[in-house]
Design a protein with these regions (language model features):
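NAD(P)-dependent short-chain dehydrogenase/reductase
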Residues: 12, 16-63, 68-70, 103
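Active-site loop immediately N-terminal to the catalytic Tyr-X3-Lys motif
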Residues: 2-3, 40
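Active-site beta-alpha turn of Rossmann-fold NAD(P)-dependent dehydrogenases/reductases
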Residues: 4, 29-31, 89
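C-terminal substrate-binding subdomain of Rossmann-fold SDR/epimerase-dehydratase oxidoreductases
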Residues: 55-159
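Active-site YXXXK catalytic motif of short-chain dehydrogenase/reductase
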Residues: 3, 7-11
Length: 159
């Protein structure tokens, strides 16, 4: 793999280790998972927790956001799939600005676009198409973001 991040290197190492020492294991590659309880310091977490968010590269970085319910279905699928490595990924890429604008529709937020591409940013997320993609009808980002805010409304969580 061609990665420079410690996260990417550790994922690759884990896959290699499993292929040598645990032949029956299925490695699951998850891509930009989001849902009602976002992990700290992810894009969705910043959008939900902050009033002002800065998007580098003018929000044009491209990502494949995968809703958490789809990840759960994919992990269940992985249990008996007899494949060494699979992708659990919504392969409909969107810009980070588009994703942020979906959140902004439901929550007041100021989005600052910064015209700076940082050295460690990947402009476009790459999904290795040679790795098997779990066949699901993945949740669109529009529907996923709506689900998040419907859940918050149901639980009476406001800003």
């Amino acid at each position: 793999e061609n990665t420079t991040s410690m996260y990417g290197i550790s994922k690759y190492f884990d896959e290699q280790y499993a292929s040598i020492y645990c032949k029956a294991a299925t490695g699951c590659r998850l891509h930009n998972v989001y849902g009602p309880n976002p992990r700290k310091r992810t894009l969705l977490w910043f959008l939900m927790e902050k009033e002002n968010v800065s998007l580098y590269n003018c929000g044009q970085n491209i990502r494949c956001f995968t809703y958490v319910d789809d990840v759960i279905e994919g992990l269940i699928y992985a249990v008996g799939c007899n494949r060494q490595l699979i992708n659990i990924c919504n392969v409909q890429p969107v810009t980070t600005m588009y994703f942020a604008s979906l959140v902004k529709y439901y929550k007041p937020i100021e989005i600052e676009l910064i015209n700076e591409k940082r050295n460690f940013d990947n402009f476009e997320q790459s999904v290795n198409r040679d790795i098997y993609l779990v066949p699901l009808s993945y949740t669109s980002v529009e529907d996923g973001v709506k689900k998040i805010f419907d859940e918050r409304k149901r639980k009476d969580i406001s800003y």
